Amino acid sequence: MAGARPLEGTLRGDGRRFGLVASRFNGTLVDQLLGGAVDCLSRHGASPEAIEVVRVPGAWEIPVALEWLAGSGRFDALLALGVVLRGETPHFEFICGECSRGAARVADRHGVPVAFGVLTCDTPEQAAARAGGKAGNKGWEAALAALEMADLRARLTHPD
């Protein structure tokens, strides 16, 4: 890439609006993801008024709430937050697949970044490690992606 300078987003939250959709199922773990995401956005300049949190029953309902938020035109980026744990039936695969596909469809349809912070884990211990434990907080990481993509979107669609 000699001579080429890639265009990347920055981690600026000031002046941007973020919509977070968080499931209530596995609520203790999701609350940790949500706390990490809100903390990250705030530390990077997003005001409390610019962060809107919508709670839905479970991961299955996340995509439709993302669709509603994206369709409102009020947000620079969206975040999906949830925890799905593998059980004894194929239900896990159905829920995880449709949640991720639905989030991607919303981003494609509306051109609004959707950061995916839905944990799909085999055990509660794996989820706890990723929701603020030894593997970090994936809610915080999703918020970083949302910040960067919101800025990149603005730079690409409204160049100064």
Where are the predicted features?
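Short beta-strand segments at enzyme active-site cores
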Residues: 53, 76-81, 113-119
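Glycine-rich phosphate-binding loop
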Residues: 61, 65-102
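Short, ordered loop/turn segments at secondary-structure junctions
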Residues: 24-25, 83-84, 119-123
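C-terminal binding/interaction regions
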Residues: 92, 96-160
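Generic secondary-structure signature for well-ordered alpha-helical cores
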Residues: 27, 42-47, 67-74, 104-109, ...
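Electropositive phosphate-/nucleotide-binding environments in soluble metabolic enzymes
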Residues: 15, 27, 31, 35, ...
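Glycine-rich oxoanion-binding loops at beta->alpha junctions
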Residues: 54-72, 118-119, 123-124
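Glycine-rich phosphate/diphosphate-binding loop of Rossmann-like nucleotide-binding domains
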Residues: 8-57
